[in-house]
């Protein structure tokens, strides 16, 4: 039977989670404040994520540790409105204006396939020295969609430092997101009922059905939108949830399922089928990067809220494609709780938690867009 790692209360301040996330947080917050206030040399690591929210969060989470290890203040370039969806519990990560006399170097960590070993920044993080990243420049700007946490934990030097900081590969991603972000008031208001349910004592199973960006409003391939999605084609995701429920539910425990999907049809059909047992928003899913203005703000609130809620689940049934479900599940800081299924591959219906092997950290982290 899969073992759950004890999860700290969502209301517990990060500084009190030292048994799970280490003790480095307050010290880095002081360094960050010293840099921003000019009390120490101004050295910044500015991060600009691309593609979808999950890709960007993967880059941002890894770059937090690069900033910690190199003594730079992390800042996030808001090419999408992070501040609309997230508050800043420990450091103010918003990008600030810089003096024109400051030196700057730009790097790219971008991929749509294998890890970008040919990128200079990746090579330094993988088996070199982070201190050489930027070669003393005041500002290092990192642009991309690739996470480097797993890479850092494979670097013979930095993995030792990360372990001494109290971090582990299985928890580092979730710890980074919790350090940087808490849901904004707008997110909490939009998902008020869902938050109450997902922070209760019920057994919570998250289900992510990803069909592709063509189903998203504002998605890259929206003009190629497929025919209406059929619930029958993805029924094995819900059968998997039923099997996990049968295997791990405690006697008398209530069960709730949380569904996130890029298909409005799947959301609507599933709600009709499963009723009150299923938590699901019936707003049309939108691609954050494909929207502008007020519509982009609303898309960001929806995406960030569902990503955060999914991390509250005890077990996660995710699609094999894309990074949204995987990265949201990693926020939970648990292991042996993530089960991957292929969309439309209905001949593989077994998801019995006692028989089917859950994903390991490496399974999750070493699949594009990586963590």
Q: What label would you give each PLM region?
A:
Residues 3-235, 241-242, 246-255:
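Secretory-pathway glycan-assembly enzymes, especially type II membrane glycosyltransferases
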Residues 276-284, 336-343:
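Short hydrophobic/aromatic-enriched beta-strand-loop microsegments
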Residues 82-85, 263-270:
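Short, charged/polar "capping" segments at the starts of alpha-helices
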Residues 56, 60, 266-268, 325-326:
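Short, well-ordered alpha-helical microsegments
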Residues 343-371:
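Leloir-type glycosyltransferase catalytic cores
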Residues 277-313:
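Donor nucleotide-activated moiety binding/catalytic core segment of transferases
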Residues 78, 209, 259-261, 317-318:
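Short beta-strand/turn micro-motifs composed of small residues
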Residues 61, 303-349:
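A donor-sugar binding/catalytic signature common to diverse glycosyltransferases
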């Amino acid at each position: 039977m899969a073992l759950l790692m004890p999860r700290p209360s969502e209301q517990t301040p990060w500084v009190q989670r030292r048994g799970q996330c280490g003790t480095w947080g307050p010290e880095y917050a002081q360094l960050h404040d010293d840099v921003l206030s000019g009390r120490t040399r101004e050295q910044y690591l500015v991060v600009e994520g691309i593609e979808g929210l999950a890709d960007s969060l993967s880059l941002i989470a890894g770059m937090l540790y690069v900033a910690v290890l190199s003594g730079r203040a992390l800042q996030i370039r808001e090419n999408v409105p992070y501040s609309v969806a997230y508050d800043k519990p420990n450091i103010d990560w918003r990008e600030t204006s810089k003096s024109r006399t400051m030196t700057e170097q730009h790097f790219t960590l971008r991929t749509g396939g294998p890890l970008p070993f040919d990128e200079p920044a990746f090579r330094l993080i993988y088996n070199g020295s982070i201190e050489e990243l930027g070669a003393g420049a005041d500002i290092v700007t990192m642009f991309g969609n690739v996470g480097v946490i797993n890479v850092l934990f494979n670097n013979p030097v930095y993995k030792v430092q990360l372990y001494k900081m109290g971090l582990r590969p299985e928890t580092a991603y979730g710890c980074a997101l919790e350090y940087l972000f808490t849901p904004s008031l707008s997110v909490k208001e939009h998902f008020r009922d869902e938050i109450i349910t997902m922070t209760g004592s019920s057994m919570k199973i998250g289900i992510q059905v990803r069909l592709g960006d063509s189903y998203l409003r504002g998605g890259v391939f929206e003009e190629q939108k497929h025919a209406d999605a059929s619930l029958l084609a993805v029924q094995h995701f819900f059968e998997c949830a039923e099997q996990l429920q049968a295997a791990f539910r405690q006697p008398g425990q209530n069960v709730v399922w949380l569904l996130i999907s890029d298909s409005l049809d799947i959301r609507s059909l599933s709600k009709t089928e499963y009723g009150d047992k299923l938590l699901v928003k019936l707003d049309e899913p939108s691609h954050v990067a494909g929207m502008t203005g007020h519509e982009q703000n609303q898309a960001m609130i929806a995406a960030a809220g569902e990503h955060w809620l999914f991390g509250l689940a005890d077990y996660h049934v995710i699609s094999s494609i894309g990074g949204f479900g995987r990265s949201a599940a990693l926020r939970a800081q648990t292991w042996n709780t993530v089960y991957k299924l292929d969309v439309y591959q209905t001949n593989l219906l077994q998801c019995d938690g006692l028989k089917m092997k859950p994903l390991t950290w490496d399974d999750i982290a070493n699949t594009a867009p990586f963590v």
